[in-house]
Amino acid sequence: MIQTISSSRPWSVNTPTALLVLADGTVIEGKGAGATGIAEAELCFNTAITGYEEILTDPSYTQQIVNFTFPHIGNVGANSEDIESLTPLSCHGAVGAIFKADITHPSNYRASENLHQWLKARKIIALCGIDTRALTILIREKGTQNAVIAHNSDGNFDIPSLKKRAQKWHGLVNLDLTEEVTSPSSIEWDEEPWCWNKGYGTNNVHNLHIVAIDYGIKRNILRLMATQKARITVVPAHTTAKEILAMTPDGVFLSNGPGDPAATAQYAIPTINTLIDHNLPIFGICLGHQLLALAVGAKTVKMHQGHHGANHPVKDLNSGKVEIVSMNHGFAVDAATLPKHVQETHISLFDGSNCGIRIIGKPVFSVQYHPEASPGPQDSHYLFQHFCDLIMNHKKIS
């Protein structure tokens, strides 16, 4: 029997044109939008109210389906400027999206197309018209789910086959996905954040040189780094420490990215450890944070439901200050496995999980959350200044 999560819909659907099929056999039906087709992925939920374009194009969401808890998604349309993946024309990011309400006509002066058209162009399959908060409760109680999302305009689905695909999908554990999203070659970055009536700015002043290792980097991270008057060189994930050192960087940034950090660590750890040994200032975000922790000997674990949203409280254990931050991760650093020379600096006030570390006696630190937000609050923008201050102080000493 088909189990459904129903919702009061603002339209009449005689034949469902999209399905979400979970590995436990649950089938959820609704109206399709965006691309047609079938995709297997991990199902998670995001509690952000705004920034759906940035969320869906974040490479960290590779092989994931995002269930939005906020009911009205798509009201401001879409454009080609707010994409977070480094290569805008690529389809890096989520493979599926789930909305409670139908996609409306856009109402925003920056919109160039409606969300349905944008989803279709980016090959993202969408399901509309279900109770996304009931689905969120399911994820909260049972954990992230392996699932299949399918969209067929004629409403014909082979449900037994979809159930088998959901059950057989391998999941994200032991999966290195940086291969799919990293830059194919090195690039120089100079774009700064968007400003009212001016658009995106350009940084022409280079007081220091930062090499950013791209494990699936977001554009707004690079923009905020550029505001620190830094020359930024983005390099592919497999770039060796020898190649990075030959670029004579003043500091190295370890980016966010998708997949299991333990899988990516197989080739990332030797590079990171060599850079640490050379006493270079290092700053990591999200996956970069996890890779740094693995490099110093800690372990990472798969989370029950992950943290995905723009309203997460994080406590700085040194100052006692609480910041509201954006998060997007399904793995976490096990703080109990941190070695003695590594200090835990931040924790989540939702579940106490690790959110930051620093290596004692070295200019090296990282955070689990996203200080660049996009979308989200700006409480942690100062970390980019902190990183560059570390670099400048290190240059004075050395």
UniProtKB/Swiss-Prot annotation:
Residues 1-207 are annotated as: CPSase. Belongs to the CarA family. The active site is at C286 (nucleophile), H370, E372. L-glutamine binds at S60, G257, G259, L287, Q290, N328, G330, F331. Composed of two chains; the small (or glutamine) chain promotes the hydrolysis of glutamine to ammonia, which is used by the large (or ammonia) chain to synthesize carbamoyl phosphate. Tetramer of heterodimers (alpha,beta)4. Pathway: Amino-acid biosynthesis; L-arginine biosynthesis; carbamoyl phosphate from bicarbonate: step 1/1; Pyrimidine metabolism; UMP biosynthesis via de novo pathway; (S)-dihydroorotate from bicarbonate: step 1/3. Keywords: Amino-acid biosynthesis, Arginine biosynthesis, ATP-binding, Glutamine amidotransferase, Ligase, Nucleotide-binding, Pyrimidine biosynthesis. One of its GO terms (molecular function) is glutaminase activity. This is Carbamoyl phosphate synthase small chain. Transmembrane segments: none annotated. It comes from Bartonella tribocorum (strain CIP 105476 / IBS 506). Residues 209-397 form the Glutamine amidotransferase type-1 domain.
